[in-house]
Amino acid sequence: MTRYIFVTGGVVSSLGKGIASASLAAILEARGLKVTMLKLDPYINVDPGTMSPFQHGEVFVTHDGAETDLDLGHYERFIRTTMTQNNNFTTGRVYEHVLRKERRGDYLGATIQVIPHITDEIKRRIIKGAGDADVALVEIGGTVGDIESQPFLEAIRQLRFEVGARRAMLMHLTLVPYIATAGETKTKPTQHSVKELRSIGLQPDVLVCRSDHPIDVSSRRKIAQFTNVEERAVIALEDADTIYKIPGILHSQGLDDFVVERFGLQCEGADLSEWDKVVDAKLNPEHEVTIAMVGKYMELLDAYKSLIEAMSHAGITNRTKVNLRYIDSEDIENQGTGLLEGVDAILVPGGFGLRGVEGKITAVQFARENKVPYLGICLGMQVAVIEFARNVLGWKDANSTEFNRTSAHAVVGLITEWEDATGAVETRTESSDLGGTMRLGAQDCQLEAGSLVHDCYRKDVIVERHRHRYEVNNNLLPQLIEAGLKISGRSGDGALVEVVEAPDHPWFVACQFHPEFTSTPRDGHPLFSGFVKAALAQHQKNS
């Protein structure tokens, strides 16, 4: 039977519920337990797929093609369970399903209410998402006290009562602020946050107290006394210099022992040696490189969360400190390529819309002409093809139909024919709905033997995740190939371009898929590892 750990947050947002939850999951997994994780998002959007990166941050794509919260990226980086569409749902998704059932008449004329219909649907989805795991950690987004979170909190209150105390527990994250003028940490916000929880029928079993200063034993004892939580279940979680230390910090305070005893689970002790190696490699690099990351959402770096983490993982596998120089592509348009001088490699990530595209194209040209290692991802591949068409093939008007629908040389175009779930072909245009209408999820890619990308993966066929609706125009592909563009990766059926490489260049790879979604700190990712190796070679050349 599955045990449930419900995770809530109080006092303020952005306390790190996702990382704390994933770290506990990693310890339980290291004890031989089968673990999964769920994220429940209170916003009314059906999914984050159409939300602005500035508002939501990254949209993490699962293996089965769901557009989900970025916390699922943390989950997959910390545990080896692959997330699916069942591991993340929103208020919008819940209401959509309930209303669809109401329209069909499934409720037999009943008045549809938050309790029981919405809460029942939330509970159903939690149980489904947990599957056959030994332990499921269920993170509720937002902060206790938010109006939006109330149906989710009521649902977990009900589910906790239904399965019993031996199968469900509540872990609450709070802030214990340090007041510099008083020279002490303050426990009152935590006390009030727990009081808010208890007012809706939820008593925490574990408190994880976040702080930027050490929390002494007397403060933890005081928190335990005022919140009815066992003293050993009051966990101090001070800011760490790397998030990959968190499993070790939680384990050192006995959190996993408390959970295992509470659930009556029989399992081995935790072997965190893999995490010790990750932390050692992260904090003790032997080399250093600087890589320019040229994007358009630089005001909120969470928009590139998985990519930034993937570069960190590549640094770990290469024992290299990777310094990312974040450059807004519009700044290149306004200030020129001087911003790129002195870097060891250039990375151009994905994005949508016209703004900043010309700056990305200029960055590609700089990398290609100056033999600087280049990695393009999604839009980063499309602008690489556009740049090649303009400056090598001589098509000065070359573009994507996303940016210029009247270009005579549209080397990138919209996918117009799609197979729906039944296999029927439907036509989509620029005016079609944006939500859920992209090429999404894991798909096969055939690699060309002898190519740079094949040297990285050492495989003929790979599986990577996608999130896009524009592709390289096959009608103009013969001219691009004749001019020297190398097609080193194609879709499983050979119909679509997946990877391109530039001729006469030490390391220039651009891919249509998103490799960052499958990179992990323990295993890294072959493409990012190869990219950092190329940056190292460039650095040594420039030294």
From Swiss-Prot:
Listed pathway(s): Pyrimidine metabolism; CTP biosynthesis via de novo pathway; CTP from UDP: step 2/2
InterPro entries according to UniProt: Class_I_gatase-like, CTP_synthase, CTP_synthase_N, GATASE, GATase1_CTP_Synthase, P-loop_NTPase
EC number assigned by the record: 6.3.4.2
Binding of UTP, residues: S13, K186, T187, K188, P189, T190, Q191, K222
Binding positions for CTP per the UniProt entry: S13, D146, I147, E148, K186, T187, K188, P189, T190, Q191, K222
Residue numbers binding ATP: S14, L15, G16, K17, G18, I19, D71
Enzyme superclass (EC): ligase
Reaction(s) catalysed by this chain's protein: UTP + L-glutamine + ATP + H2O = CTP + L-glutamate + ADP + phosphate + 2 H(+); L-glutamine + H2O = L-glutamate + NH4(+); UTP + NH4(+) + ATP = CTP + ADP + phosphate + 2 H(+)
Chain residues that bind L-glutamine: G351, L379, G380, M381, Q382, E402, R469
One annotated GO biological process: 'de novo' CTP biosynthetic process
Gene Ontology molecular function: ATP binding; CTP synthase activity; glutaminase activity; identical protein binding; metal ion binding
GO cellular component terms listed in the entry, alphabetical order: cytosol
Domain Glutamine amidotransferase type-1 positions: 290-541
Active site residues per record: C378, H514, E516
Activity regulation, per record: Allosterically activated by GTP, when glutamine is the substrate; GTP has no effect on the reaction when ammonia is the substrate. The allosteric effector GTP functions by stabilizing the protein conformation that binds the tetrahedral intermediate(s) formed during glutamine hydrolysis. Inhibited by the product CTP, via allosteric rather than competitive inhibition.
This protein's record includes keyword Nucleotide-binding: yes
Annotated segments matching region Amidoligase domain: 1-265
Source organism, top-level taxon: Bacteria
Residues bound to Mg(2+): D71, E139
Annotated keywords: ATP-binding, Glutamine amidotransferase, Ligase, Magnesium, Metal-binding, Nucleotide-binding, Pyrimidine biosynthesis
Family: Belongs to the CTP synthase family.
Further facts: CTPSs have evolved a hybrid strategy for distinguishing between UTP and CTP. The overlapping regions of the product feedback inhibitory and substrate sites recognize a common feature in both compounds, the triphosphate moiety. To differentiate isosteric substrate and product pyrimidine rings, an additional pocket far from the expected kinase/ligase catalytic site, specifically recognizes the cytosine and ribose portions of the product inhibitor.
Quaternary data: Homotetramer.
Function: Catalyzes the ATP-dependent amination of UTP to CTP with either L-glutamine or ammonia as the source of nitrogen. Regulates intracellular CTP levels through interactions with the four ribonucleotide triphosphates.
Protein's name according to its UniProt entry: CTP synthase
Species: Pseudomonas savastanoi pv. phaseolicola (strain 1448A / Race 6)
Gene field: pyrG
